[in-house]
């Protein structure tokens, strides 16, 4: 695998290489730009975004660009777009990952007829901004079976030669004979002590979509990405039903909170806290304030506050609708000022169809949320756009008190 230089622009989405036309902003306090549109630029869909802000202030968005509608296991590239003016304008989409040679298909997906030989799948790219080193680290997977590390020292113009780190995942085999691995998705974190921490999930690939059943853990680096180690298994199915895409954040006392996607009937996000981001995890609890529509969310620390975003599609359970409404819609952001004990304020970013999201902030007080949005379809949702919202933290505080 190699990471490409900035020499492979993808067909631009609009004349002049700005953004897809902006959707109307909710208020003058939030600016929303559409960066990708389905069936444009040579790809059928754009999914699973991640966002970070480099130490120099460049906003960087990376996405999975899917050539067909065959889901997670189809032909996928990784594209990047960057903004050098706080999200006002964006450069052209560029493919940044390419594998040399023929890629072996994932045996679990092949057994379920989800993929076929010759199909190259790049997935779950994870950025980590590292101000102390002046770099942005990246982890990425291929075929949900191999993992790589690279970094950029010039805001995404070039990347270091990638290093395969699949051996880090091999260390899980003594506890769990995985067939499927995935980093993130979304951004990882740099702890205040310098440790790089990336949540991961693994599956034996025997269940639905070859992504289930599953376990959650972390991998970490204490030497700036040069080497990576595995953490303890945090939780596994059936202790928590199919835990997967997990978010990490450093709390005010230096401990690390994980916020875990799951398929439990509680329909609430699962939370655990550990001292170092790798071990000593507390008993899993459900956060009653944070709805789980079985979808990736995002978690970010900004000063003394925590921000959490995901589709908050709550409709109360009733005799007519005993399960309530757990569709991917009504993307909302909440704020906590007590390390996630309570989430008193909420704002809606996208009231309609919405899905995966990720959060970042810059040194000028701007918060960025990249997210999937779209249109209703026979299957419930259809991701048509990838958009970026920019706002200030006071915009959230001015929202509805919960």
What does each model-identified segment do?
Residues 14-16:
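C-terminal motif of bacterial Sec signal peptides marking the signal peptidase cleavage site
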